[in-house]
Amino acid sequence: TDVGTTITLFLNEDCLEFANEYRAREVLNKYCSFMPTEIYLVNETAEPEYETILPEEKTDKDTVIETIIEDAKTEEKENENGEKEIVEVSPRTEKLKILKRPVPINDPHPLWTKHPNECSDEDYKEFYRNVFHDYKEPLFWIHLNMDYPFNLKGILYFPKINTEYDSIEGTIKLYNNQVFIADNIKEVIPEFLMLLKGVIDCPDLPLNVSRSALQNDGFVKKISEYITKKVADKLIGMCKTEKETYEKYWDDISPFIKFGCLKDEKFCDKMNDYILFKNIDDKYLTLPEILKPVEKDTEKDAADDTADADDGESEENEYK
């Protein structure tokens, strides 16, 4: 017995393109690739396809067409006594021919729904390749996972940029309950983050409002601030604990950081001390590291001036 509801969709003449299997698959792949319920697209008019399985692999959902018996295979071989005998090479097997099992076209458990501890580096890289069709490995990524005061999950990737040939523009895909909404919605995602690639899923995001309303929504502003803070924290943490890696990535991430400092005051306040500059020895230094020797020289000069002044006063006292 079939379980569930059958919905028959009647299409107007100007919408008949959606009756085409490939067009329907295209739409489903775009908007429902990560929908939490499995989706199967089956063309009922196509010729049926079959596959064979072992009896123990059969499930209640399988439609068995026939049972296939394969007789045991034997060969004539010589035994230890040099006598020829018939030896069984492979035993008699039983297989089931069934209608080919449909494969879901979506992944109901995308990487961003999992805890970061459950994800390996290869998982992140594979997800990046599959979603963005970019086969250059990302430099690093940030896994967003927040439950309070709002529900937000996602992954932001820092792509490797070849500025001579590549566009610096990225892609941030916005989802609501794992259903795709749109790319690069600037009312929700800070403009400078558009240089990155990633996915953000926020079930609490209001969808039935205009873009102007989104822009003035305090809740949306909090989402934007949270994402900005997490990105800054990741970069600062890397600079403090993995300075060599931070320096190695600098040519790729500096356009993003500098643009972010121009566009977002809070991001700028956090990142000011972590922007790198090269000195004449081709060594990377932060602004505080550059100013530190200057401050020491200033303090030394001030101390020397004080000492000279004290010596001058002593000499004056001697001649009085």
Please provide the spans of the model-predicted regions:
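Conserved GHKL (Bergerat-fold) ATPase module
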Residues: 1-320
